[in-house]
């Protein structure tokens, strides 16, 4: 929903009728603050986050000649989601745990490396792996945010630490996985952790000194404790507080700003997307209802001060984990014969939004994937018209589309002003939503209020679940408000997108490496199998007259960890890296690394033990070790663990803390010995059932 600027924030404005969008503005106007194109200086190439490269040497005619120029391997496993930055002939890329690598962009030689030395135990608070989506570079400084909440500035020439500042208390279950954004001397960063019961905020720091300049909290705190003394105090009091009920602060509230931001230098507005509530089920966190601002909202603030300007809430009172943290693109479209500055987003809830980015006015909202939780977005109010039963009242489960994975997750999309199309890594899925019986808050643990049912020990059911999910590259026309084309993929979890002036769209395809598609038709023109999945956005740059395509690759991310059993190629413990292609490249592709395999112990668990073990596994183990006990990204696969051989061995890391120093927490305060034995029985059963998936 749209709200007025701060000075009239108590007045609710009508969104008005949806206007007819006529045509995109010329390409030169669409890529705001766009560089010449030889470098890739920002996360989304430019401040508008278009991810559109003007380079055209690699085009639809020449792309078949692309070959590997070089590759660089990281020195540790876990998830890789970064978009590289290329400035001054150096490629800056972050790997797992926020380790930064500076690499010669011509030949792949390491120039320097910075390891922030994050304690291994902090990984327990990372819902979706210890990933890092990238760095920011400006004025000779490289900025990176670490999993344990430090924002650091490094010397771009040698990696020396220039300053480091904590952005939150590392003892709290916050994390950071997002890339910082730099805008006119300020570095902006948010955080994650809503599933663990935190309160979200975004902060701006002085790029030269690391001093905090402003902070904007996205949900209200405990009213009894008074205001925060932050720039968000007034909008929280006037707009957000009336939309919450009960004692939401006991659960944290959520609303973390864990990914997308964009900046309009002309308006000098910073836009950020806000995440889901904590817990997910609104009836738990806010009994009595309410929109729960600013959850699932796009918020515009003044860059220099953080002062609130407007917001639009994509999913009022979110109960489905429908974040608005997905990639936002700034562009100009012609509406009723006049140019309008717009913001475009395809958030998890399945609707594609076009907003006036100066005012927050809703211009269009249309389904881009199958959606059943709402029939449409009402153009007058800007609110979704919800389906009966969508909020899964007690005793009435609901099969929701999209699922909590969303129609589009964090993987970046791209905008091509020449074709007038937005290219989206879209996905179709269904989620089972029901209230968690006897919910109890477990501080520092996974607290969504929605149970994770265990994967049953039945190969046919697993195959059905696999078939219920799909992914595709979607070309969306914001003028016609419809899909121009869709190209299906083999699996549901695919990578970010790069569009180029050569008429190409590059995307990482799950289980298949990097592929290039015709931007006008969606035809696949080229593919290179890296055997490591590419999830972050590919980039393009030019050196010595040659155009390069680069992408970071690796196993990890939330789906590799939690749902690898559903993917066409499951991950492993291999370290990720960077792959770079050019026309005529002849470097050999590194060979795929084999997965460690062990014979499963005899399956002697009773049906009761396996059923109970599956429930416990889904609650405490699945998020890291994978649904159905099939792991997929740097964390050991328990089916092949030496500790699985005997019950007494299996208890040692689980309840005795044997591997705590390596990041495996002890569950002694939660699980008894017989609980550990039941979990082992489930893992052994799944090892026998899923052995063919390896």
Model-derived segments and spans:
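Short, conserved, GDST-rich strand-edge loop motifs in beta-rich repeat architectures
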Residues: 189-200, 245-246, 272-292, 397, ...
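Repeat-blade elements of multi-bladed beta-propeller folds
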Residues: 40-44, 79-99, 124-150, 175-196, ...
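Extracytoplasmic beta-rich repeat domains
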Residues: 72-83, 113-136, 161-179, 217-260, ...
